[in-house]
Design a protein with these regions (language model features):
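Bacterial N-terminal signal peptides that target proteins for export
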Residues: 1-13
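Generic short amphipathic/hydrophobic targeting helices enriched at N-termini
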Residues: 5, 16-17, 27
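Intrinsically disordered/low-complexity terminal segments and short unstructured peptides
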Residues: 6-7, 21, 82
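Bacterial N-terminal signal peptides
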Residues: 10-23
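Carbohydrate-interacting regions of secretory-pathway proteins
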Residues: 24-262
């Protein structure tokens, strides 16, 4: 009887582990350009002005100079049918990041995100910020640790995964927020990133916020190392460049007992 109970418990544990592995592995099969949001995710940009106004706002950081409604424009998709979002807000002309960046009104801790972008011109520059803190660079022509696809200053640029100018690209990310105990940081934030279906960063620890106070939440705290236990939205950066976005969706997660790898 004891052996039967043990066998039953072991089988249940195995089944649970298999389900978790299958769930994560199934994510890897539903990534890249054109990936559709799962039922448990929320769409944050579907090409409409209505959704932009409903779910996004300007990030009002220390350098903020915009004025609502958001001045990012809705334009025709240059590749496929439909409309997309252009990050070229006139307020940010000349590379003035932080003046007209947009962020989701909803804030997050752990999440999975899908963002598609297209850079039409050489040197096109924007950025995707996890929890309005940690930037995944969007910058044509730069393959350094500050370049395209890099978790800025934390990893090398996976430039090899880039589809190139005038083509759609996709970031698929699972992010785990920093953990705190009694108000003290005990675990740094981590992320796994796929770039156009290729895994480029695996369960990568993120040490700090880079770029100073105009970059995002906590950017001005102890040189970006003073991370606080505050959730943040998904932010897109305006630097006065034509960078297009579409098909943005986010799935909230609870990764207390799991890595970000998938």
């Amino acid at each position: 009887m004891k052996d039967l109970k043990f066998t039953t418990i072991a089988l249940c544990a195995f089944a649970l582990a298999a389900c978790m592995i299958t769930g994560f592995s199934s994510w890897a099969q539903k990534i890249g350009v054109g990936a559709k949001a799962p039922r448990s995710a929320e769409v944050y940009f579907d090409g409409s002005r209505k959704m932009l106004d409903e779910k996004w706002t300007y990030w009002k950081g220390p350098r903020f100079a915009g004025e609502l409604p958001v001045k990012w424009s809705i334009v025709k998709d240059p590749v496929n049918k439909g409309t997309v979002l252009n990050a070229n807000d006139p307020t940010a002309a000349g590379g003035k990041y932080g003046t007209a960046d947009i962020v989701t009104k909803k804030e997050f801790r752990d999440f999975r995100a899908h963002v598609e972008f297209l850079i039409p011109n050489k040197g096109g520059n924007s950025g995707m910020y996890l929890q309005n803190r940690y930037e995944i660079q969007i910058l044509d022509g730069d393959s350094t640790k500050h370049g395209l696809g890099a978790l800025i200053n934390e990893t090398e640029s996976p430039y090899y995964a880039y589809n190139g100018l005038g083509k759609w690209n996709a970031y698929d990310v699972v992010f785990r927020a920093a953990r705190f105990r009694d108000g003290k940081l005990v675990e740094k934030a981590k992320a796994t990133v796929y770039f156009n279906g290729k895994k480029v960063h695996s369960d990568q620890e993120i040490s700090q916020v880079w770029g100073g106070p105009n970059s995002g939440i906590d950017g001005g705290n102890d040189g970006g190392k003073g991370i606080t236990d505050v959730p943040g939205g998904l932010k897109l950066q305006a630097e006065g460049h034509d960078v297009l976005y579409r098909n943005i969706w986010i799935q909230e997660l609870d990764l207390d007992n799991a890595s970000t790898d998938f």
